[in-house]
Amino acid sequence: MSMKRFFGHTMWTGFLGILLLCGGHASAAELWLDIDTTKHTLYLMEGDKVVQVFEKIAIGKNGITSDKTVHDGKTPLGHYKIRWINDESRFHLFFGLDYPTPEHAATAFMEDRISATELEAIYRAHERGEEPSGSTDLGGSIGIHGVGHGDLRIHQNFDWTDGCVALTNEQIDELAQRIGLGTVVIVR
């Protein structure tokens, strides 16, 4: 068995273990976010019930992707959790996601885009509930944020972020009343 295949198998096994321990989805009573990039809409969900709808969100200026690379301007699809909050962000308020996930990292490792050391560091960050490093080819610091002092007309008419999901400042303030650390976020 090749070293790459061995590490790939070992890492996928570890990833499945993390999913089982952390849970792949929110329980029926928890609030979670469903972000529909095609409709440019963020849904605040409780179980399978829509609680609130935020329309005209902006995504990455170059669309969406399942295999994001640093500085590509694309919003990564996937299942995340909010890991950190910056209420002093230049974007008004920033909810940081746990991107890259172990799944993103394992795929990138199998495609020779990150090293075994980088893969292991991303896994360890997830195990500890910390923000994964953004210094790999996968990038990082992906989240949900406001516009800050940006031009609201641009936000309403264009996808403008470097990969994040953006709402108006008013929308992000309203959303902040309902979500926090650990909130599940699905970007599709």
What are these regions (language model features)?
Residues 10-23:
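Bacterial N-terminal signal peptides
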Residues 37-41, 45, 54-69, 74, ...:
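Secreted/periplasmic proteins
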